[in-house]
Amino acid sequence: MRIERVDDTTVKLFITYSDIEARGFSREDLWTNRKRGEEFFWSMMDEINEEEDFVVEGPLWIQVHAFEKGVEVTISKSKNEDMMNMSDDDATDQFDEQVQELLAQTLEGEDQLEELFEQRTKEKEAQGSKRQKSSARKNTRTIIVKFNDLEDVINYAYHTNPITTEFEDLLYMVDGTYYYAVHFDSHVDQEVINDSYSQLLEFAYPTDRTEVYLNDYAKIIMSHNVTAQVRRYFPETTE
């Protein structure tokens, strides 16, 4: 514990959490156990009195700042003459109340720090997850086409013969138009993707709509093996 004499009526000390534990107090007990908290602060006052001859006379003003490695405490004697005339019992009671108040304030500060830490941790996790998804998306190739109507979607489902099963697909609808997005795995050959795209264009049309636009404004009708779902729910159309 480091003690600094500011003037005749004020002292400042800084004590690390390891110093607190060395004195037989745990960090949790200090902020959550009233009796242990008072015991700790009175022991500090005894040590301050021994080193700096700072005798407790009358009420004290106490200010506490919690840091990552410890706490800084500023203690000042009151200069108010009326308060200086208080009895020892009244002064002790007021000191105890101030100790409890500063403990509560410091505990609240600790809670706020923990909430801030949790918030930053969640933000970092979200950013990490977003980077992972972005990285995963870079390792895939996506094609998007549009169908004029549901009949074209059904015709494609019954006449297509997927060259590969290594893809994920989504069927969107917005403003009465159907959009079909296919995400190919990174190891699928570009030639296979080109063939699949050519097969799609026999029933659908190119589009400048992006996946971001569709996710924001369109409704997902089907996902995961869309063609199989279409064949399950809709009969083949006859020309």
UniProtKB/Swiss-Prot annotation:
Family statement: Belongs to the MecA family.
Cysteines engaged in disulfide bonds, as pairs: none
Source superkingdom: Bacteria
Cited NCBIfam families: PRK02315.1-3, PRK02315.1-5
Description of how the protein assembles with itself and partners: Homodimer.
Biased composition (Basic and acidic residues): 118-128
Region Disordered, residue ranges: 118-137
Entry's Gene Ontology molecular function annotations: protein-macromolecule adaptor activity
Protein name according to UniProt: Adapter protein MecA
Function: Enables the recognition and targeting of unfolded and aggregated proteins to the ClpC protease or to other proteins involved in proteolysis.
Swiss-Prot/TrEMBL domain comment: The N-terminal domain probably binds unfolded/aggregated proteins; the C-terminal domain interacts with ClpC.
